A protein has these predicted regions:
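Chromodomain-type histone methyl-lysine reader module
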Residues: 1-150, 154-161, 166
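Polymerase palm active-site segment centered on the conserved acidic dipeptide of motif C
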Residues: 155-162, 184-192
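Active-site beta-strand termini and strand-to-loop segments that position acidic
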Residues: 168-170
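Histidine-centered acyl-transfer/condensation active-site motif
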Residues: 173-187
Length: 192
C-alpha cells in the first residue's frame, strides 16, 4: 500500500527500507530462465546494540529425521520398485513458490515500510507499507513459519517438540520437515 514517506518516519523513526531487484537464472546456459524479484535490504542491518541480524534457518537434522523415518518404518531396507506395493515408501519434495509473500503481517506487529523501486512513477514521493512479508525483511522468516505451522496444525499435524519444523500426522502416518520454503514428506502405504 503506497503511503507518504513522512508516515514511515513518524511511525518508525526511520526512513523506508531500500529495495533492490534480484535476478536469478533458474535454467542453464543453453536454456536460460531468468526470474526477478524485489527484495528488501534490511537483513544486513544492525540492531540498536550494534549486533547484526540473521535469518533463522532450521537445522538439517529435521530433514534427516524424516528420511530416517522413511527408511526404518517397515524395517525393510531393500528398494521396492513396484509402485502398487503396500510397503512402498514415498518421499515427496515440495517447493513453495513466493513463500514469504504468502505470510500475512500480524496487525499487532510494527509496520514495515519500503522504498518504491525506481521504475515506479511515485518513487521518491511515496513509499510502500507492507501488507504481507517481503524477502529481506527481518520478520519474514518468522511470519512464514507462523503461517505454515498454523496451517499444518489445523490439518491435524502435531508439531515436534525438539524440532519445531518437523510435523507428524498421527492418523495418516505422514512426517513432514520444513526448511524455509521446502517441504519434505514421507509416508508408507502400509506397514506389516
Amino acid at each position: 500500500m503506497k503511503v507518504p514517506i513522512s508516515e514511515a518516519r513518524s511511525r518508525t523513526g526511520r526512513p523506508p527500507i531500500s529495495v533492490r531487484w534480484v535476478d536469478v537464472n533458474k535454467g542453464d546456459d543453453m536454456v536460460p530462465n531468468y526470474r526477478s524479484r524485489l527484495a528488501a535490504r534490511q537483513m544486513k542491518a544492525l540492531d540498536s546494540s550494534g549486533a547484526s541480524y540473521f535469518a533463522p534457518a532450521p537445522p538439517l537434522e529435521a530433514l534427516r529425521t524424516v528420511l530416517s523415518l522413511a527408511m526404518t518404518k517397515c524395517g525393510n531396507h531393500q528398494p521396492d520398485w513396484d509402485p502398487l506395493s503396500p510397503q512402498r515408501v514415498q518421499v515427496s519434495l515440495v517447493d513453495v513458490k513466493r513463500a514469504y509473500f504468502n505470510a500475512k503481517i500480524d496487525p499487532e506487529e510494527p509496520a514495515t515500510f519500503v522504498k518504491l523501486p525506481s521504475e515506479d512513477p511515485d518513487a521518491g514521493k511515496l513509499c510502500g507499507r507492507l501488507l504481507r512479508h517481503m524477502y529481506g525483511t527481518r520478520p519474514a522468516a518468522d511470519g512464514w513459519q507462523e503461517e505454515y505451522s498454523t496451517m499444518l496444525v489445523g490439518l491435524g499435524f502435531r508439531q515436534g517438540g525438539a524440532s519445531p519444523n518437523v510435523f507428524y500426522h498421527p492418523v495418516r502416518k505422514i512426517a513432514t520437515s520444513v526448511h524455509g520454503d521446502d517441504f519434505t514428506s514421507e509416508r508408507t502405504k502400509r506397514c506389516p
